[in-house]
Amino acid sequence: MWARNLGNLMMSPLKPIEFLLSLMVMSLLRLAIGVIPMTLLAMFFFDFNVYGIGLPLVAFFCNLIFTSWSLGIFVSGLVLRNGLGAESIVWTLMFGVMPLACIYYPVTVLPHWLQYVAWALPPTYVFEGMRALLIVHVFRADLMIDALLINVGLLIVSFGIFLALLNSARRAGSLLQGGE
């Protein structure tokens, strides 16, 4: 969008699924570039080894990545269809979702009726599972599997919405209008 190259990209033989998969691979590379040096610095300067948590950390972290992919795919579709202005809506949405994902506190802190909303979000399962792992030293596979199932559903829905928004953007001609 920012380089005004999207029109050229969408006229190429690139399939939408290939476009999305390339975005996902690039997100993993960017994540690795950011996370690996920071964890190594934390080990060196603070003697904090996040890798000591083991494989459960990888499973929960993958669930967070899947959640971010589903949201990112949905947002990409919105931006393709409606322009860069749609991005601000998503930033607002994220700040609204963060308290419901129970990042900083357990789900039980929320009012009872709001707990149902929180349990509909995959990050809630991840952070509750991480709390159980760090505080009680118990790996809650049920929470990880529940998060994974919700994430699979969200990814399927976000792929479908992206394809619908991309087709709508092609029909409306908004792919060539985006940019700086």
Task: Give the location of each predicted region.
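Alpha-helical transmembrane segments and their short interhelical loops
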Residues: P16, L21-S88, R140-N151, L155-I156
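Transmembrane alpha-helical segments of integral membrane proteins
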Residues: Y125-V136
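Short helix-terminus and kink motifs of transmembrane alpha helices
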Residues: G72-S76, T108, F159-N167
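Short cytosolic helices in intracellular loops of multi-pass membrane proteins
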Residues: G7, M11, L21, F95-M98, ...
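Hydrophobic alpha-helical segments typical of transmembrane helices
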Residues: R4-L6, F74, W113, I161
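Junction motif at the cytosolic side of a transmembrane helix
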Residues: I150-E180
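Transmembrane helix boundary and interhelical loop/hinge segments in multi-pass membrane proteins
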Residues: M1-S12, S27
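Transmembrane helix segments
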Residues: V75, V79-T124
